[in-house]
């Protein structure tokens, strides 16, 4: 009988060591996985804002073709529904009139000249990843109708469709 009680004590100690090893392995995996996941989330948010802002290009083209090159561009604000990833402190409107929820933002349209040059600017804010807050995505239209995208996000978050404009 004494042999069985000694065996139980030895097994109990071994189980505790196993649990400590498992916890250590989980900790190491978490230390590697969490930063990778945060990078993935930030990259997906950049892609989302590029798409949401780029979707407004059609409305801008319609306005250019119809000669609506107003400075305020309220007739040409497109059909943006707002985004929880964009800053809502600037032009917090959609179609120039409908207010966007305070936790939402919309791209800002500006006609640079009367020749059809324009910019669509989205500023990250609200629920965007902290490393993106304050960064911008800018779609620029030249007078020939060619659109180019530039951003100031860190190089590791950039997307092929919208390269960073700096060497960060």
Mark where each language-model region is.
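N-terminal leader/signal peptides at the extreme start of proteins
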Residues: 1-17
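Short, intrinsically disordered N-terminal pre-domain segments
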Residues: 2-5, 61, 165-168
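Alpha-helical hydrophobic helix detector
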Residues: 20-36
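Short, conserved catalytic or interaction motifs in soluble domains
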Residues: 12, 31-34, 39, 46, ...
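Membrane-proximal N-terminal amphipathic helix
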Residues: 42-72, 78
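Conserved helix-loop functional segments at active or binding sites
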Residues: 3, 28, 52
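Periplasmic/extracellular, small/polar-rich flexible segments of pilin-like filament-forming proteins
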Residues: 65-168
């Amino acid at each position: 009988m004494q042999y069985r009680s000694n065996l139980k004590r030895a097994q109990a100690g071994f189980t505790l060591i196993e649990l400590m090893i498992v916890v250590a392995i989980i900790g190491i995996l978490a230390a590697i996985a969490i930063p990778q996941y945060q990078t993935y989330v930030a990259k997906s948010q950049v892609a989302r804002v590029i798409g949401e802002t780029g979707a407004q290009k059609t409305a801008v083209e319609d306005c250019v073709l119809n000669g609506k090159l107003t400075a305020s561009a309220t007739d040409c604000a497109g059909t943006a529904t707002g985004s929880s990833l964009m800053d809502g402190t600037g032009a917090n409107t959609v179609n120039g009139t409908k207010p966007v929820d305070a936790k939402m933002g919309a791209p800002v349209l500006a006609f640079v000249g009367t020749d059809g040059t324009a910019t669509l600017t989205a500023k990250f804010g609200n629920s965007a990843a902290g490393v993106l807050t304050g960064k911008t995505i800018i779609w620029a239209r030249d007078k020939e109708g060619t659109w180019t995208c530039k951003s100031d996000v860190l190089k590791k978050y950039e997307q092929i469709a919208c390269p960073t404009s700096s060497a960060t």
